[in-house]
A protein has these predicted regions:
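FAD-binding core/adjacent interface of flavoenzyme oxidoreductases
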Residues: 1-12, 78-166
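Beta1-alpha1 glycine-rich phosphate/pyrophosphate-binding loop at the start
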Residues: 2-82, 86, 160, 165-166
Length: 169
């Protein structure tokens, strides 16, 4: 692998994304003789498998989020930048994020996935995704508001409709 770093310096690895793949990549390189920068737009890692419990009020958002800096605290070769990646300049080998430039010799793009509406974007207001803490708290708010409205409804059919939920996926 050809490295563009200056003579005598360590290879620069930039990991974009602080989800499972990005964090595991960073941790796997803990003992490597490199300078690693992990960039994410959030300063926390969200444990997505438990987001449904945040949405249903069984857990608080703090129970499924851990500061990325804390996770990588003991890793001497790593630093964390909270920034939103705007572009990758392939010619200069730099990631451009929040008006800063992060030079790299090796780039790992681990930005995760998003939900899809399969050509039906009009479903989005009625079928929110569940990938972020904000998604979970929005779903929680919608559920609690539906119960509040159902409690005030006099018509049993309206009450039934307000307390009927469909989960897809």
């Amino acid at each position: 692998m050809a490295m563009a770093q200056q003579a005598g310096s360590r290879p620069r690895v930039v990991v974009v994304g602080g989800g499972f793949a990005g964090l595991e990549t960073a941790k796997a390189l803990a003992k490597a003789p490199i300078d690693l920068t992990l960039i994410d737009r959030q300063n926390h890692h969200c444990f997505q498998p438990l987001l449904y419990q945040v949405a249903t009020a069984a857990l608080s958002p703090a129970d499924v989020a851990w500061p990325i800096r804390s996770i990588l605290r003991g890793q001497a070769n790593a630093r964390v930048a909270m920034a939103e990646v705007e572009a990758v300049d392939l010619d200069s080998r730099e990631v451009i994020a929040s008006e800063r430039r992060f030079p790299y010799d090796v780039l790992v793009v681990a930005t995760g996935a998003t939900h899809a509406y399969f050509g039906h974007d009009d479903w989005a207001p009625f079928a929110p995704g569940l990938k972020r803490i904000e998604d979970a708290t929005d779903i929680r708010r919608r559920i609690l508001m539906a119960f509040e409205r159902a409690e005030l409804a006099e018509d049993p059919a309206v009450r039934q409709a307000l307390t009927t939920f469909v989960i897809v996926g």
